[in-house]
Amino acid sequence: MLRLITQLSEAQTEIKRIAARTHSEQVQHQEATVREILQNVRRQGDEALLRYTLEFDQVRLAPGDLVVGAAELDAAYQRVSTSLLKAIRLAKQRIEQFHRERICKSWVQFQDRGIVLGRRYTPVDAAGLYIPGGRASYPSSVLMSAIPAVVAGVPRIVLVTPPNPEGKINPAVLVAAQESGVHEIYRIGGAQAIGALTYGTRTIAPVSVIAGPGNIYVTLAKKLVYGEVGIDSLAGPSEVLIIADSTANPVFLAADMLAQAEHDSLASAILITPDGRLAERTIEAVDRQLENHPRRTLTEKSLANYGLVIVTADLAEAAALSNLFAPEHLELEVEDPWELLEKVRHAGAIFLGHATPEAVGDYLAGPSHILPTSGTARYASGVGVETFQKCSSLVQYTPQALAEVGEAIDALTAAEGLPSHGDSVRLRLQQYENPHSPTQQQQEE
């Protein structure tokens, strides 16, 4: 089931294949469907949302059912266990503590001649958070997306998630949303939810930024609306890449690989090690742990299609293969992970050492688990406070400072053929030099 590869060229080919697993002709067909859904939501608003909820979720809603009301929110607390509520609050505390250290702070710099330069950070007006739902429940994704928005100071935070077959939202999701500070919750999902957040409907006001993971339809919808709203990233199937040496425990490695593969049939789990015996023992451990796995069929399919065990010449070669893949999650299960870290350039989140399984980061370590996938860690980052903030440059000049750069600006504007740019400086300097002389406009009047 798990393929063992010992040739570098074959390993490179397979890693590229797995990284491109979402790029298919089927995606092109799905994009056409998503485009139609978005257009209908833009034109028909709530009517389209209700129709698509019935079609895709098999749930019939009335217009007033889209919003999750106070009674359902209050009742959610009665339907979660004390242990789960305690875990949600612990996760919230740790996630919030981490993100408070990441707030982008405004600054100004005072230079000679009275020049002031700086940057001013402000939150977006409204953030939309997409949380997968239906039969599944992901309260951790609520915490990981909502808390950075709250810390950023976003005044309106909206959460959308598809209902279950009874038309309800999982109580754990509702509790996590309330604990995190979400302001509005709507029971809609899929591409239609992204359309509602982008264009607005009678019930749902539009937002400025959309964040959160979803299926291929949600991802394509985010891709198509980007530019009208901001987005965090285009999420693909989940993935983990583990670099291990002889100090690693194959039982732990197998568990970490299965933890990724059990997500869905497109998930990827890759182990790279210079220790051939460790590679073989890990494959054996995977087989043993799969015997009574409750999601065995799905997990086996994932491992068969997108699971690899690669034996390399050394750890440097392993790091090079990891950089080629640019994984969402990277585990460094080696004797000195901080030394190996120096060779790592591309990864969404990096877990260092034998006692740091990815699951710690998935739930409560602090950094968001909403991370770049499908090789996008080469240029993208995970969700954070900065996802919900934007920056304005600050510039102030005095007449004296403007005079010192006037000649340079005049030369540059002349080179670009933009005379009014030059005039905007020249006219000011003329007035500053002769404050009592009339400007050209005054002369013409």
Swiss-Prot record:
GO terms for molecular function: histidinol dehydrogenase activity; NAD binding; zinc ion binding. Substrate binds at S238, Q260, H263, H329, D362, E416, H421. The keyword NADP does not apply. Pfam families: Histidinol_dh. NAD(+) binds at Y130, Q192, N215. GO terms for biological process: L-histidine biosynthetic process. The keyword NAD applies. The active site is at E328, H329. Keywords: Amino-acid biosynthesis, Histidine biosynthesis, Metal-binding, NAD, Oxidoreductase, Zinc. It catalyses: L-histidinol + 2 NAD(+) + H2O = L-histidine + 2 NADH + 3 H(+). InterPro entries: Ald_DH/histidinol_DH, Histidinol_DH_CS, Histidinol_DH_monofunct, Hstdl_DH. Belongs to the histidinol dehydrogenase family. Pathway: Amino-acid biosynthesis; L-histidine biosynthesis; L-histidine from 5-phospho-alpha-D-ribose 1-diphosphate: step 9/9. Its EC number is 1.1.1.23. It comes from the Bacteria. This is Histidinol dehydrogenase. Its cofactor is Zn(2+). It is an enzyme of class 1 (oxidoreductase). Catalyzes the sequential NAD-dependent oxidations of L-histidinol to L-histidinaldehyde and then to L-histidine.
